[in-house]
Amino acid sequence: LQLKEDKIIGSYQHWDGYPSGLGYNLIDNWYRADKVEKAIMLGDASKWGQFIGEKIGFDNREADSYDYQNVYYGRDRGEKDCNHKVYTSEEAYLKNGFNSGEDYIYLGKMIGQKDYLGREQVTWFYAKYDMKKFEPLETVAIMDHIDDLKRHMKEQLKEVA
């Protein structure tokens, strides 16, 4: 997330970091800057859901909120050294944001986009490890998500036939 003073805060998210997965989740659920900042400040996560959530057993997949909330390495598993990172610029983020083997990194910016109530919201951008700059995320995430859904439906239809 790019903060007002242009520094960027970020954290690693392990599960399904592709535009059709995490990218789609970001544009669908993570458009309030205060919510995004709080989530990032909790550090590296196994997965991001629809909301931050409360401390939960890391492997407690039976918990009612497990499928919907974020699950963090520090808060939920007690790991150390998994705090958020601070980058001085987009260039620094592009250079150093792929240190955990990520294929994609994401950047939320406040560029004046508003929600239906007129409140400012985060606009998301992404970069693949071989890209030189961030590109708008929304169209790519939606199209990739649709492709994933089509593949899923094709598999379901094979099973029925």
PLM segments and residue spans:
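Low-complexity intrinsically disordered segments
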Residues: 28-161
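Short, extreme N-terminal segment that most often corresponds to the first beta-strand
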Residues: 1-18, 22
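All-alpha amphipathic helical-bundle segments outside canonical DNA-binding/catalytic cores
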Residues: 25
